[in-house]
C-alpha cells in the first residue's frame, strides 16, 4: 500500500462576538490515506462556545461538516466527528480519503453576544 500524504490546511475564524476573540490552529496537518486526522482549534474557554467546522476545497464554497461542537449535518460521512471539552475543540476525520484534502475552518459562535 502506497503512503499518500494529504495536506489539510487549517484556518481559524471567529464570529458572533463584539469583543476580540483569538483562535489558534496549526497551519497544516499531513496525514496518510486511511489514517486518522485530528485538527484542533484553541481559544480561551472555547468549551463554553459553539464551535462549527467547515471544509473548503479549491474553487468551491465552504461546506459545514460539524455544527455546535459535535453535530453532523445530513450528508456528511460518519468519519467526521467533533468535540469541544474545554480550551481546545477538535475535528476528527477517521479513515482519511483523498477527497478529504481541503482547507478546514473552525468558527466560534458566542451565543452570549447579540452581534
UniProtKB/Swiss-Prot annotation:
Residues 1-20 form the signal peptide. Gene3D superfamilies: Immunoglobulins (2.60.40.10). GO terms for cellular component: extracellular region; immunoglobulin complex; plasma membrane. Pfam families: V-set. Residues 51-67 are annotated as: Framework-2. InterPro entries: Ig-like_dom, Ig-like_dom_sf, Ig-like_fold, Ig_sub, Ig_V-set, IgV_Light_Chain. Residues 107-115 are annotated as: Complementarity-determining-3. GO terms for biological process: adaptive immune response; immune response. SMART domains: IG, IGv. Disulfide bonds join 41-106. Residues 42-50 are annotated as: Complementarity-determining-1. It is found in: Secreted; Cell membrane. It comes from the Eukaryota. Keywords: Adaptive immunity, Cell membrane, Disulfide bond, Immunity, Immunoglobulin, Immunoglobulin domain, Membrane, Secreted, Signal. Residues 21-115 form the Ig-like domain. V region of the variable domain of immunoglobulin light chains that participates in the antigen recognition. Immunoglobulins, also known as antibodies, are membrane-bound or secreted glycoproteins produced by B lymphocytes. In the recognition phase of humoral immunity, the membrane-bound immunoglobulins serve as receptors which, upon binding of a specific antigen, trigger the clonal expansion and differentiation of B lymphocytes into immunoglobulins-secreting plasma cells. Immunoglobulins are composed of two identical heavy chains and two identical light chains; disulfide-linked. This is Immunoglobulin lambda variable 3-12.
